[in-house]
Design a protein with these regions (language model features):
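Pentatricopeptide repeat
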Residues: 7-8, 12-13, 17, 28, ...
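Acidic, Ser/Thr- and Pro/Gly-rich low-complexity regulatory segments
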Residues: 1, 5-6, 16, 95, ...
Length: 151
């Protein structure tokens, strides 16, 4: 079968990203399917493509497939998939994964958690996620203020 060689995964990842940024989800998925050895960058790119096109359930399914393939999500992967969560229970499950990965204090992840909990009106957990950051940046503060402003 024809596939993108594992010798240079950068090419496949770049193509997935390019198609995703152009809004060509099907092309991004086709290239992703050709990548023989999918790393966290490839998985994150295809998950991001689905989220940007509004295919949230599919993005979460891809995230689950990524974990089943024993590819560890990074901070950016978690932050993207948290934006796709449609049920609080899903978000809490992913939050447990984040804690297990010891990424909960990273600003990009904690800010995504603040936003996710805020969308569901769980201000206590949003505040707790914020408090995990040692040095919240302006995006974190803006997100927290927005969450409190919504409720």
């Amino acid at each position: 079968s024809k596939g993108i060689s594992d010798r240079n995964p950068f090419v496949g990842n770049a193509l997935v990203n390019m198609y995703a940024k152009c809004g060509l989800l099907q092309k991004a998925q086709e290239v992703f399917n050709l990548i023989q050895v999918r790393d966290v960058v490839a998985w994150t790119a295809v998950i991001t493509a689905h989220v940007k096109q509004g295919f949230y359930k599919e993005a979460v399914q891809l995230f689950d497939q990524m974990k089943e393939a024993n590819v560890k999500p990074n901070a950016f992967t978690f932050s993207i998939v948290l934006g796709a969560i449609e049920e609080l229970s899903e978000g809490k499950s992913i939050h447990k994964n984040i804690i297990g990965s010891k990424l909960n204090g990273q600003n990009v992840v904690a800010t995504a958690l603040v936003n996710m909990y805020g969308r569901f009106g769980d201000l206590k957990e949003a505040q707790n996620a914020f408090n995990e950051m040692s040095k919240p940046d302006s995006m974190a503060w803006t997100t927290l203020i927005s969450v409190y402003g919504m409720h």
